[in-house]
């Protein structure tokens, strides 16, 4: 696996800040084990990020060898001891190879990150409404989630301060005041707001925990109810478990909606135009030979040829992504041009 300092070409296929602390009989073995474990973990994170939550699809992809999809890794820091390896690394996975595996498995995925979405948790109990108070379990669970999540939907939370509390008081936020929600979205630079309510209801003989999640646009208009649940507080309800379960359900709904709206479209066009720079006829014939060996190309025809450049029309029997993957295995890169269906063939630079 090559070590590089460059930026990963596709952020969706990058995992950064991976902490390694592994032990083995030798320092070298500890390094091998640590990096292998980190690669498996990072690959799982990428798959969880780009595919719609689905246990079967996840298992299909994670059954593949993670190290075969690695483009490069970058070591931020490391300390190699006699029987221990401590490091922090970033791993970049090869987008074309992962896409190829997804296509072969017949799976759908997305790669586009969302603009910021504000999480706005509200907690209500007999003593009052809490939005900006610290050390409230409901509020803390959402803060922890916002800090740790690393999927395609990018969430944000407002950091409590005196000025914010005065401009966004708790009671109007509880009532979903449209202007207050819009002001909160503006303060966070968010395009949407997830209003997250949890409260204790003592109006019945058995108290209840009520949880509700609603999605609003940046103007404070309701878009959808994304979660709703009531639980009896009969002495058997664990608030930590209840909050985490509701949180997972709500986030799955939002993630699925984003994925469905931004599914990666496999380019299944019938033909593409490929241009390539050459220095001799030998180069030209070599390129044509390599292209003719790619499984996704059914036929090739010459469009133009000069002393320095050639152009070929390729009739495809598969997707452009499959052709790109096949060429990559031969040391070439097929780069999309400015015009639709136009590509440039280049030697990969290692």
Model regions: which residues?
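N-terminal segment of the mature soluble domain
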Residues: 35-58, 115, 121-179, 287, ...
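Signal peptide-directed extracytoplasmic domains
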Residues: 51, 55-121, 131-137, 174
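C-terminal soluble interaction/assembly domains
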Residues: 219-236, 245-249, 270-350
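A short, hydrophobic beta-strand-centered structural micro-motif
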Residues: 67-77, 159, 172-208, 212-214, ...
């Amino acid at each position: 696996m090559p070590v590089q300092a460059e930026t990963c070409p596709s952020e969706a296929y990058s995992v950064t800040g991976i902490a390694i602390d592994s032990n083995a009989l030798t320092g070298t073995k500890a390094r091998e084990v640590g990096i292998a474990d980190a690669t498996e973990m990072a690959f799982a994170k990428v798959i969880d990020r780009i595919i719609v939550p689905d246990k079967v699809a996840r298992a299909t992809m994670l059954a593949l060898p993670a190290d075969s999809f690695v483009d490069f890794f970058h070591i931020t820091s490391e300390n190699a001891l006699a029987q221990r390896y401590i490091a922090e690394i970033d791993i970049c996975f090869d987008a074309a190879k992962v896409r190829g595996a997804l296509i072969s498995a017949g799976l759908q995925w997305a790669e586009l990150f969302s603009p910021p979405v504000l999480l706005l948790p509200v907690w209500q109990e007999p003593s009052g409404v809490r939005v900006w108070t610290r050390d409230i379990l409901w509020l803390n669970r959402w803060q922890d989630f916002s800090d740790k999540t690393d999927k395609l939907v990018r969430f944000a939370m407002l950091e409590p301060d005196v000025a914010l509390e005065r401009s966004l008081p708790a009671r109007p936020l509880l009532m979903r005041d449209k202007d207050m929600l819009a002001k909160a979205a503006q303060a966070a630079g968010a395009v949407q707001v997830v209003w997250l309510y949890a409260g204790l209801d003592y109006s019945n003989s058995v108290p209840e925990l009520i949880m509700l999640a609603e999605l609003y646009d940046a103007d404070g208009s309701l878009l959808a109810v994304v979660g709703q649940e009531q639980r009896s507080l009969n002495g058997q309800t664990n608030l930590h478990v209840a909050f985490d379960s509701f949180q997972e359900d709500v986030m799955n709904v939002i993630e699925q909606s984003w994925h469905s709206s931004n599914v990666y479209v496999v380019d299944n066009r019938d033909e593409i135009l490929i241009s390539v720079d050459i220095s001799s006829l030998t180069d030209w014939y070599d390129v044509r030979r390599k292209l003719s060996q790619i499984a996704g190309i059914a036929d090739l025809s010459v469009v133009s040829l000069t002393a320095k450049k050639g152009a070929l029309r390729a009739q495809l029997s598969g997707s452009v992504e499959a052709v790109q993957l096949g060429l990559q295995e031969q040391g070439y890169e097929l780069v999309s041009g400015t015009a639709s269906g136009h590509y440039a063939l280049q030697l990969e630079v290692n």
